[in-house]
């Protein structure tokens, strides 16, 4: 069986930057999970003493605090700034972009529509910068019953699919007089999704490596399943099953933006020993 990696996969700029920050900030604590990958978070804890706090209420005697890649809410940031702590911001620059857009456009009187998951930490952070009305939706059907003004600004969670974002934009074009569209989907996300789709079209089995709570990794799984029914999401090599590869000729592999190369190599090695 041939094993083929997607042309684009794995660590994005924002995650690489955050990992480097954490490694250079030993014996610190992150506010929320730094990235959505349990294996890498465990490595940072064991090797560099970087622990994870669920939220700011858990802060005690920590002297150095790291803001997660997904960012935090404006209120939480203000609280952190008021504390006598060293604050290191690992928020991805591409996540800060929709935060800034939402703050600016809402201050200019625009209703804000965010395409994303309302429970995702990135979306919670972006939403908190709105000064007026803000709506979070995942599809067009959710927009139909909302009372939105004729002056709207649209942004997206950085890890969402461009096709679905476009559908939201097209609908709003027919219902508003003034619409400002900001494509805040990360370019690395788009490239990884495109590469996964291309590989899944020819693969007999697809392995997607990443955190099961990772938005961009789950998107890769959904995309792969559109073209390859034998698509599986795993966090590490121990979750692989031999029967997945029986009578298969091509195994495609891709990985989420928070998946380190060392995990990917372990998965490839394990598949080689199984086949």
Swiss-Prot record:
[4Fe-4S] cluster binds at residues 12, 92, 186. GO terms for molecular function: 4 iron, 4 sulfur cluster binding; 4-hydroxy-3-methylbut-2-enyl diphosphate reductase activity; metal ion binding. The gene is ispH. It is an enzyme of class 1 (oxidoreductase). It catalyses: isopentenyl diphosphate + 2 oxidized [2Fe-2S]-[ferredoxin] + H2O = (2E)-4-hydroxy-3-methylbut-2-enyl diphosphate + 2 reduced [2Fe-2S]-[ferredoxin] + 2 H(+); dimethylallyl diphosphate + 2 oxidized [2Fe-2S]-[ferredoxin] + H2O = (2E)-4-hydroxy-3-methylbut-2-enyl diphosphate + 2 reduced [2Fe-2S]-[ferredoxin] + 2 H(+). HAMAP family: IspH. Pfam families: LYTB. Isopentenyl diphosphate binds at residues 36, 70, 120, 214-216, 258. Coiled coil: none annotated. This is 4-hydroxy-3-methylbut-2-enyl diphosphate reductase. Dimethylallyl diphosphate binds at residues 36, 70, 120, 214-216, 258. It comes from the Bacteria. Gene3D superfamilies: 3.40.50.11270, 4-hydroxy-3-methylbut-2-enyl diphosphate reductase, catalytic domain (3.40.1010.20). Catalyzes the conversion of 1-hydroxy-2-methyl-2-(E)-butenyl 4-diphosphate (HMBPP) into a mixture of isopentenyl diphosphate (IPP) and dimethylallyl diphosphate (DMAPP). Acts in the terminal step of the DOXP/MEP pathway for isoprenoid precursor biosynthesis. Binds 1 [4Fe-4S] cluster per subunit. Its cofactor is [4Fe-4S] cluster. (2E)-4-hydroxy-3-methylbut-2-enyl diphosphate binds at residues 36, 70, 120, 158, 214-216, 258. Its EC number is 1.17.7.4. NCBIfam families: ispH_lytB, PRK01045.1-1. Belongs to the IspH family. One of its GO terms (biological process) is dimethylallyl diphosphate biosynthetic process.
């Amino acid at each position: 069986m041939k094993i083929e990696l997607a042309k684009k996969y794995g660590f994005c700029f924002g995650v690489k930057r955050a990992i480097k920050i954490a490694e250079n900030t030993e014996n610190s604590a992150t506010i929320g999970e730094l990235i959505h990958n349990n294996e890498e978070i465990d490595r940072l804890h064991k090797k560099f003493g970087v622990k994870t706090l669920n939220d700011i209420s858990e802060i005690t005697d920590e002297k150095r605090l790291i803001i997660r890649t997904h960012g935090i809410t404006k209120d939480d940031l203000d609280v952190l700034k008021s504390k006598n702590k060293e604050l290191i911001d690992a928020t991805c620059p591409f996540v800060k972009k929709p935060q800034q857009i939402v703050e600016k456009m809402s201050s200019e009187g625009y209703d804000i529509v965010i395409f994303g998951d309302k429970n995702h930490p990135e979306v919670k952070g972006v939403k908190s910068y709105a000064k007026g009305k803000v709506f979070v939706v995942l599809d067009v059907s959710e927009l139909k019953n909302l009372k939105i003004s004729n002056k709207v600004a649209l942004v997206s969670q950085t890890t969402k699919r461009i096709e679905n974002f476009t559908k939201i934009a097209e609908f709003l074009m027919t219902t508003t007089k003034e619409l400002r569209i900001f494509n805040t989907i990360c370019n690395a996300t788009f490239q990884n999704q495109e590469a996964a789709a291309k590989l899944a079209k020819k693969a007999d089995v697809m392995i997607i490596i990443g955190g099961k709570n990772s938005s961009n990794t789950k998107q890769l799984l959904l995309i792969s399943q559109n073209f390859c029914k034998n698509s599986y999401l795993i966090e590490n090599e121990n979750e692989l099953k031999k029967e997945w590869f029986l009578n298969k000729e091509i195994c495609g592999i891709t990985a989420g933006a928070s998946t380190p190369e060392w995990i990917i190599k372990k998965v490839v090695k394990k598949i080689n020993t199984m086949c």
